[in-house]
Amino acid sequence: MLQLARFYSLARTKAIHSHGAPFRPEYALKCGLEIHTQLNTKNKLFSQSTNSATSLVDAPNHHTSYYDIALPGTQPVLNLEAILFAMKLSLALGSQVNSISQFDRKHYFYGDQPQGYQLTQHYRPFARGGKINLSKELDDIDESAKEIGILQLQIEQDTGKSHYTETDKDVITLVDLNRSNVPLIELVTKPDFSDIKQVRAFIKKYQNLVRHLHISSGDLETGAMRVDVNLSINEYARVELKNLPNTSSIINAIKYEYQRQVELISVGDTSSLMEPETRGWTGSSTVKLRSKETTIDYRYMPDPELPYINLAPDVISGVRGLMPQLPDDIMRILMKKPYQLSLKDAKILTYNSNQNDMYNHEALRSYYLDTFREFSKLAGERSNAKLPTNWIIHEFLGDLNKLQIPLAKAKEILPPPVFAQFLKLLHEEVISATSGKMLLFHILESFKQSNCQDLSIPDFSKLIEKFELHAINQVDPQELMDLCNDVIAQHTDDTFIRNLVTGKKKSSLKFLIGQGMRRSQGRIKANEFEKKFKEILNIQW
């Protein structure tokens, strides 16, 4: 009987996944998020312990104080840096920062919560309201625009971590309090999400925002950002989803839970959807953790040891005046004249993945903008906006990643005015694009071979002469003809040539031009090859 039940459960899980969980209008999804974000303050929220919650190398209980382990007689001292970080995030979201907020005790007993309560802001949160705007243009959602409202933001302390070790006789619980008392911001959204794309876009945008503001690493994988989902269908009760370690888990859990509830509703088995419940994600399905009947009474009460947070209007306005330009505004500027970047390239300069040691988005954007200005001065009205984009974002970054040279180091030999001179050589066709790639890689490779110690600014003229990289202005007609014929001779497939000549596959011409450029080592320009190939093959289109 037990085996039969397991078989049925497994079959049902596979069936739900096979449906792909499409969202149907008759089963309207209503979804909201609760996001806990660890703040990367220097110290913890109520003690002088170093804040190193996401470090993977620290010994257990290394970053702890008497207060963090709840030694009797110790008292909390509020870290004002956490208040500043919370204010920056609130202002970036357009939230109303409350002039008075307070900390409350949330009582529960657990091994990794030594105080027996958590300090949070239940009655008077730090900020209310606000929103994040999503758009089809920037966020790849289906609607032209979608506003996700924010209910509130509150500051609270994180808990410790429990680690379980199995022995021959028992299971031992080990407690690490390095994370205990690390400052968190809990953000609660309104239930404004109606599909998966919106959820994914919101998480990515919020993640980038906290990184942009330098208040958190925003990493889901290390627990610096943790997301719970509140989900309901039509007017049925809310289900909370927990244990969601990354974006794919969040998306898959929503898909699974949506389809699970749709199946229950469609067969009339809605008794389990009448009361709120909490469910966990196992990696393939959601399982019930607790229902309303087992909901914990946290017995909230104002903390008697901490005074109110009282913020004067000039403090809030002062922080507002120090706020950086926000990512969406930056992207829209970059996508317009004079830069005219694609969305993909604009995101490279605006979104910080937090995973690239060679550069961060702010340093890269600053380098790009400075180089663009210098190049525009040199080239004047004839400047080509695509040159800085293609050569910095694609060629230059590609070389840095390949050679593992940090941008900060590369800037020492190729500062923006020097890189602008390099772009001018390409713009004036002193060297071809192929020669430019060879020259740029040689400069960076030589710098790498010196262990980034040779800070000599490259002399482009000498290097061009040394490697004979000058573009050929007077092309030898016979040499060009021979090169083109050699390239064509390599393609014995008549279909390839026929599709090219008839225009059925015009992209093949670019392939032939690329082959010719390689054979000439970039000395002969692409347009010369294009004209000669069209002449030889009698291409009329």
Curated annotation (Swiss-Prot):
Keyword rRNA-binding tagged: no
GO molecular function (one): glutaminyl-tRNA synthase (glutamine-hydrolyzing) activity
Catalytic activities: L-glutamyl-tRNA(Gln) + L-glutamine + ATP + H2O = L-glutaminyl-tRNA(Gln) + L-glutamate + ADP + phosphate + H(+)
EC number: 6.3.5.-
Superkingdom of origin organism: Eukaryota
Task performed by this protein: Allows the formation of correctly charged Gln-tRNA(Gln) through the transamidation of misacylated Glu-tRNA(Gln) in the mitochondria. The reaction takes place in the presence of glutamine and ATP through an activated gamma-phospho-Glu-tRNA(Gln).
Protein name in the entry: Glutamyl-tRNA(Gln) amidotransferase subunit B, mitochondrial
Organism: Saccharomyces cerevisiae (strain YJM789)
